[in-house]
């Protein structure tokens, strides 16, 4: 299939810039015939006793760091004043002139070396070791191997330049962990399409799932943002089971597909973990023909990556699974997810799960109903097409 097969027109005003007033007050679209539009707090009505909901418990870290670097410019002939935020570092005064009207002399700088301050943003991507991470830098061309950036008694060092825009950084910290450092100096890494950043404290809360517990994601597993403690209690009261796995979402989740032949696209790798207890619950539900509901595409990708001949394995691993139409699913019966970008790997995934034509039709309905898209947007409950 071609990349253009997964395109659709999305009005920009439907891209959610803010979360709903309350987590569970977002809209929920049930992929029934015809579609049912309701509120998320009614999701309990579409689940039944014995269902098993599988959540991703990864916690978003403050993975965005703002750096400042003084960038030297070439030596220039410069006769008048210095402009902007440039600072004169050195000046060679080789010509002394006399003011004929006053008789006084003055020095004319013929050659100066200038410096300009550059603002650089890095977004951590994946943990490579205790103190080393891969990251995406913008603009990466302003960074050099060996550059050091100081945060009080701590240092961030550029140790390698990888693919275009990607770097490797090392943290040299004074008696704190990388996560503690990021919590103090970093910012929540909101997607670029969310243009407001003024309410950082609010984003720290709302761009995090209430059940998140294991630090490591640089973007939220957004399907879970709608859940509240009240909904979790109602699930328990209805004898609906819940369990957790981990996939640390990397910054590569926002990278676009650039090849028209979708099978030429290379997925980023992400760390996953499934505990023995979680694997046992999932396999038991499958054996007893109970429905398995994957909360989010990250959960579904982890389940399918770990499944061998219909059995989910307990393991720690990395996955770069790329799910497109034609994929044979072995785990989830239902997928809860937000609305995704045109031509994205996630839209391809839901087309594989619930049907290519069906998803184009459902998204057309959602757009007509002015439902809200992407991270802070509304949710949809999709049923696997057999």
UniProtKB/Swiss-Prot annotation:
Q: What is its EC number?
A: 2.4.99.17
UniProt cross-references to InterPro entries, sorted A to Z: QueA, QueA_dom1, QueA_dom2, QueA_sf, RPE1
Q: Which UniProt keyword terms apply here?
A: Cytoplasm, Queuosine biosynthesis, S-adenosyl-L-methionine, Transferase
GO MF assignments: S-adenosylmethionine:tRNA ribosyltransferase-isomerase activity
**GO terms classed as biological process:** queuosine biosynthetic process; tRNA wobble guanine modification
Pathway(s) annotated for this protein in UniProt: tRNA modification; tRNA-queuosine biosynthesis
Question: Which top EC class is named for this enzyme in its record?
Answer: transferase
Q: Which reaction does it catalyse?
A: 7-aminomethyl-7-carbaguanosine(34) in tRNA + S-adenosyl-L-methionine = epoxyqueuosine(34) in tRNA + adenine + L-methionine + 2 H(+)
Question: Does the record's keyword annotation contain DNA damage?
Answer: no
Check the record and name the HAMAP family matching this protein. Answer: QueA
Q: Which NCBIfam families match?
A: PRK00147.1, queA, RPE1
- The name this protein carries in UniProt is S-adenosylmethionine:tRNA ribosyltransferase-isomerase
The encoding gene is queA
């Amino acid at each position: 299939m071609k990349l253009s097969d997964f395109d659709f027109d999305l009005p920009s005003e439907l891209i959610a810039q803010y979360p709903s007033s309350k987590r569970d007050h977002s809209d929920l679209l049930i992929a029934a015939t015809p579609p049912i539009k309701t509120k998320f707090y009614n999701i309990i009505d579409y689940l039944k006793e014995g269902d098993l909901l599988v959540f991703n418990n990864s916690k978003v870290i403050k993975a965005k760091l703002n750096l400042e670097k003084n960038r030297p410019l070439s030596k220039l002939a410069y006769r008048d004043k210095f402009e902007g935020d440039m600072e004169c570092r050195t000046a060679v005064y080789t010509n002394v002139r006399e003011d004929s009207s006053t008789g006084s002399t003055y020095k004319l700088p013929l050659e100066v070396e200038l410096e300009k301050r550059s603002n650089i943003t890095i977004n951590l991507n994946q943990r490579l070791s205790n103190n080393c991470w891969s990251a995406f830098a913008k603009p990466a061309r302003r960074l050099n191997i060996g550059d050091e950036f100081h945060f009080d008694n701590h240092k961030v060092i550029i140790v390698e330049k990888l693919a275009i825009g990607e770097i490797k950084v090392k943290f040299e910290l004074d008696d704190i962990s990388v996560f503690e450092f990021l919590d103090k100096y970093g910012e929540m890494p909101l997607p670029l399409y969310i243009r407001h950043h003024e309410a950082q404290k609010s984003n720290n809360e709302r761009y995090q799932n209430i059940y998140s517990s294991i630090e490591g994601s640089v973007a939220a597993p957004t399907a879970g943002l709608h859940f509240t403690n009240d909904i979790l209690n109602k699930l328990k009261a209805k004898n609906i089971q819940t369990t957790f796995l981990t996939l640390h979402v990397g910054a590569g989740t926002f990278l676009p597909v650039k090849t028209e032949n979708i099978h030429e696209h290379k997925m980023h790798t992400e760390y996953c973990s499934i505990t023995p207890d979680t694997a046992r619950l999932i396999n038991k539900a499958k054996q007893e023909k109970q429905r398995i509901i994957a909360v989010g595409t990250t959960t579904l990708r982890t389940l399918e990556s770990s499944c061998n001949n219909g059995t989910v394995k307990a393991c720690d691993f990395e996955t770069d699974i790329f799910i497109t139409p034609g994929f044979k699913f072995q785990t989830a019966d239902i997928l809860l997810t937000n609305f995704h970008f045109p031509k994205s790997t996630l839209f391809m995934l839901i087309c594989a799960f619930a049907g290519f034509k069906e998803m184009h039709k459902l998204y057309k309905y959602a757009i007509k109903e002015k439902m809200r898209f992407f991270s802070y947007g509304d949710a949809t409950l999709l049923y696997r097409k057999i």
